[in-house]
Amino acid sequence: MISSATKTLQTNNKTIYVAILSTLTFFLFLDYIPGLQAWSAWVTPPVALFLGLIFALTCGQAHPKFNKKTSKYLLQYSVVGLGFGMNLQSALASGKEGMEFTVISVVGTLLIGWFIGRKIFKIDRNTSYLISSGTAICGGSAIAAIGPVLRAKDSEMSVALGTIFILNAIALFIFPAIGHALDMTEHQFGTWAAIAIHDTSSVVGAGAAYGEEALKVATTIKLTRALWIIPMAFATSFIFKSKGQKISIPWFIFFFILAMIANTYLLNGVPQLGAAINGIARKTLTITMFFIGASLSLDVLRSVGVKPLIQGVLLWVVISLSTLAYIYFV
């Protein structure tokens, strides 16, 4: 029988949960009010994820069923909305240059990630694969798209996303400094940043800090790599199908493709509409990160340990050095 003190604690935790979620949502949508946009700048996916993690580790899981169900569907809707931020023609055009290296780097990252995660550190399959996918393609967006196809648990998503976001934050500060130390041209740095930094947002930030040409090169190359979400999602559904289990067709990826096509050919005359839908999708993705973080438990975190972070760091270092070698010697 639950004591009155326990009931009071659970009620308080649920109140705190609602307060955090309401605050995040409130500040997120201040972005649409002229003059108040700056107030929403701090609400980013990493911040939302870590707020969810802090809540879960200090207060426990207030609404586990709500978190699980909401994060599942909101994540898929958000991925579809992200398609309205991509131009298919631009991505394909930028992909013609260096296509061979793009293919090699994506496939190579997945294979190296598998070896480090599964063979060396014995990390669970889903977490290791999500970290490798995020490193190979476009960070959190790739994990958001691949996770539902993989039927990954919220705890596995949290660990993978947390690893990627930590490395993203580090890259945003150290990459420009390393680029200047190595006297890299803006084109070289843009190429390196697009391949070695996970999330598009951090790629854009690092490119902008280095120079205008670096920003342009980094953005176009990263856009091309983001298209790999599509074949990766379908390949994942086939590769990880259990014996006797039907193939899980990632239908939301079809809608992602349709959104991208619509944005390229139907909304090219009204780019504001595509940008608005994409903006809402990014905000719902940020809220989803809170749900995913709030689903983690201290027991899960203890069982996982630091191995996923070590996999992410080692994989990141290997890809960064390999890309540098390609830029300088090929």
From Swiss-Prot:
It is a multi-pass membrane protein. Keywords: Cell membrane, Membrane, Transmembrane, Transmembrane helix. The keyword Cell membrane applies. Its main location: membrane. The chain crosses the membrane at residues 16-33, 38-60, 73-95, 99-116, 128-150, 160-182, 189-211, 221-240, 247-269, 284-306. One of its GO terms (cellular component) is plasma membrane. InterPro entries: UPF0324_pro (IPR018383). It is found in: Cell membrane. It holds the Pfam family Cons_hypoth698. It comes from the Bacteria. Belongs to the UPF0324 family. This is UPF0324 membrane protein BT_4609. The lineage of its organism: Bacteria, Pseudomonadati, Bacteroidota, Bacteroidia, Bacteroidales.
